[in-house]
Every structure is written in C-alpha cells, then in structure tokens.
Amino acid sequence: MPMEVFSLTSTAIPSTLTRRDTAADKPSPHLNLSKYSHFMRYPLTTTLTNNRIRSSSSSSSSIRAQASGSTKSSTAEGIPEKTDSKDDNLVFVAGATGKVGSRTVRELIKLGFKVRAGVRNAQKAGALVQSVKQLKLDGASGGGEAVEKLEIVECDLEKADQIGSALGNASTVICAIGASEKEIFDITGPCRIDYRATKNLVDAATVAKVNHFILVTSLGTNKFGLPAAILNLFWGVLIWKRKAEEALLASGIPYTIVRPGGMERPTDAYKETHNVTLSTEDTLFGGQVSNLQVAELMAIMAKNPDLSYCKIVEVIAETTAPLTPAEKLLTRIPSQRPYIPSPKKVQKADTATVSNTGPSANVVAEVPSIAPQKETASKPVAKTEQPLSPYTAYDDLKPPSSPSPTKPSEKKQINISDAVPTPISSDTPSSIQEIDGISQTTSSSKGKESLSPYAAYPDLKPPSSPSPSVPTTSLSKRDTVVVSSNGPAQLSVEDTPKNEEQHLHEPKSRPLSPYAMYEDLKPPASPSPSFRKS
C-alpha cells in the first residue's frame, strides 16, 4: 500500500507547473537554445530530445517540462565538450592542377595526408586524378588506395564566397597559384591571380582559423636584385606577389613563405644532380630549382609545422651543395615568432604523458627519492680552480727541464787543475780536506782566472794576424826583423844609435799613390797630342 501511494504521487502533475506554463504560445527559453545553437553543434542529441517530446502523451504543459528536463540531462551527461573541429590530417591545396600544385598533392598523399584539391574546373582535374591513382602507398602512409585520400573541390578564388565552403575543416592551406605563362599578354593577370585571389584565400583562412598557411611566391619580391628583378617586366608580378605576402603577414595566422628560384627549365630529374639549399629572406636573387623539389619541401613543412612556423625561406638547388635532409635545413632558418602548438596537439601530449607516468602509487613512492636530489642540488658547490698545466693531473709526468747554464769557471777550474800544473808558492797556502773518503783541495784565496781557452792548453796558441810593415824601400843593414809567435813583428835595433832609434819610431809619411811601392809599375801615360805636319 505505501508503494502504491508513492507511485500515484510520482505520476501526478504538480499544479504549480501547470499554472506556470499556461501560456502555450510562449516557448521555453531552454527549448529555443536547443533548437538553434544546440542543434547546430550537436544535432544527434537534439534529435533524441525531439523524439522523446513527440512520444510523450501528456498535456502540453507537461511536455514542455519533460523536454526541458531531458535536454538538460543529455547536455550534461551524453554530449562531449567541443575542443577543435580542424582535421590535422587534412590539407587544402589551391592551384592543384598547376606544375607545383599537382606535385604537392602527390607528395602530401605519400606522407599520409588527405587532400582537398581546389580547382576552378573539375573536368580539368582528370590528369591529377590519374597521376594519384598510379601512386602506391606503403604502410607508413596509411596504406589503401591513394585516390581515396584525394577530394576534388571546385573553387574560384576570385569569388570570395566560394572559398569558405571549399576549405572545410582543413587545418593546413597551401597556396600554389600564379598567373599563367600562357596568358603572358594579360596585363591584369598578376594583379588578379597573384594578389587578389591570394588575398581572398588568406581572408577565408583567417576566418576559418586554420593552423598553418604555406604560400609560394618568388625570389626578389621584397628587395631589388638582378636577375630576379627582370620578372617585374611582366606587368610587375613581383610587386603583386609582395603585396600578397604582406596580406598574409598582416593576417596573424601561422605562415610559411617559400620563395623558389627559376622553375621553368629544370625537370624532375634535376634533383639527381642538384641538392636543395635554403637561405633566409632577401639573400638570393638568382638560381634554379625544380617543381618537384619545391613540392617535396612544402609537404615536409606541412608534416613538421614546428620547423617551418612563421619563416620566410628562399630555395634554390646547386651541384656543390651537400645532400642534407629538409628537416635539418629548416632548423637553420630563424623563426619570426615562437612556435605555439595547436590545442589538439597539446591535449595529445598531455594524455601521452599521463599514460606513460603509470599509477599514482608509483608517483608517490618516487617522491622521497627525488627530494634528496633537490636538496643536494640546492646546496652551492664550491668550484675549485683547476690549473691550466696538464702536468698536475699525472704524478709521473714532469715538464721538460731546459739545462740551466753553469758558470764557465767551475768546469774550467777542474780542467785547468788537471791539465796545467800550478806552481807551488808559499804565499798561497792550501788546505786539504777529506769528506767521506773524497779529497778536495780548496784554496784560501782564489785569484781571477782567465776566460781564454788558450790558458788550459800549453800548445794552443791564438792565431797571429800579420801586422803591416813600414812602407820603406829598404831597411838598413843593421836592422833585422824579428817575428815573434806570440806578438806582432818587432824591429831589433841593437847596433843603431839613439838618434836613428828615435828616427825609426817616428811615423813616416806614406804616399797615397800605389806606384811608389813598385819600381817597375808606372802609371799609364795618356798620349800627348801632336801637331799636324804640313
């Protein structure tokens, strides 16, 4: 009986609720929210709510109450929160039927991306579809048919209202459009295609809040330099490309601007003999690179947005350049803004770190082991100055010692005492001392010893240079020349008188002419002029 009373009470409709909803024409504010904004975000949940409303057989006031209650419960419990609707694996390529665009589509599919190819006429995309069908994907690219990853989208970039729907939920946009070479006589081509159409795509990507925008322009767009500046003869194409770059820079979305060299003559086999080199902005004004090399570079940029984030890259290919991966080349180019990852990548990184850490018990158990390390790290460690010499690190290693100069008197004292017998004089007393069986002779008074080596050897005499003789024609009979080995030549004047001796010591005047020394030598006589005989 109590259970039945409870059942009857629970199924009854409160009078207050009926009175509050007497105005049937005024809809509930919560129902209006679920009808519009909630339906746009979560159509499945709103459909279930409407089915519950239709299946109810109660009065109109009770229906509104039940619908309001069911909507609240489904929103709180069954609807996940919306974080980011962009597909990180989807890329929109503008100009997909061009030389660079078609190769970019194939390279993106090889890396596992899904591609929305934007073309003005879908009938002209048959060659692109056939080339994609010929691709063979490996396991790293996701496998399956390559054409399943391609979606052709008709879109005229000169009409801004068509671009938003063509982008879809692509997270990356690659713009590879440009004025056609076939329409070289079209004066408005660079302005319409290279600037206005590109600006429309940039504006649509800004509204869609894409994660990455890659734009292909050309060398010499910002700074004048030959031979790149010659392209401005074709209706100022570099000027319009620069205005497109400025529109992308002002949009605020993450960007990468690729400025390739000449791509008209190089074929796809160009990469076999020429390697790609990357330079910073306004560095190169000439060079060539193939369309395939530029397409491969942009596909790698889309795969690694952190390496190409907010960078302006100039690309050419050279035979002398080393073969370097594009990822390593991109790291050498400085970024103009710090890299900010997308919310999806941040959420994935957080979940990956949480899954790798394990249960909370292990974390608590590891805390005590971490604490002592922090304490030891906080203590200041006194740094000891290490000597610069390597000899302090090894005990047995000694620096090479240069021989110290010794006084010449020490060695000469021993040699002289051994070789030349010194006369024994009573004036110089000597004392003999024996120390440990060795007799040493020390003289009380040491005289000055000669530094000349000739004193050590009695037979060794210094060379004597001949002294010049007095320029006299002949000497007197009583004068004899005595040549001593130890000194200069001397004249012996034993029998000469004193006046002659004084006369010999006086210097005599020497004639300046050499002819006085030789009797037979006469100076040459110049011929004297003779008179003519009549």
From Swiss-Prot:
**What is the extent of the transit peptide?**
1-64
Q: Which stretches does UniProt call biased (Low complexity)?
A: 421-432
Where does the record place the region Disordered? 50-83, 334-534
Subunit details? Part of the Tic complex. Interacts with TIC40, TIC110 and TIC55. Interacts (via C-terminus) with PETH/FNR.
Top-level lineage group: Eukaryota
Gene Ontology terms, cellular component aspect? chloroplast inner membrane; chloroplast stroma
GO terms under biological process = protein transport
PANTHER family documented for this protein: PROTEIN TIC 62, CHLOROPLASTIC
Q: Any idea what this protein is called?
A: Protein TIC 62, chloroplastic
Bilayer topology reads: Peripheral membrane protein
Which residues are in coiled coils?
none
Q: Where is the composition biased (Polar residues)?
A: 63-76, 350-360
UniProt function note: Involved in protein precursor import into chloroplasts. Part of the redox regulon consisting of TIC32, TIC 55 and TIC62. Has a NADPH-dependent dehydrogenase activity, but only after preincubation with lipids.
Against SUPFAM superfamilies, the record matches this protein to: NAD(P)-binding Rossmann-fold domains
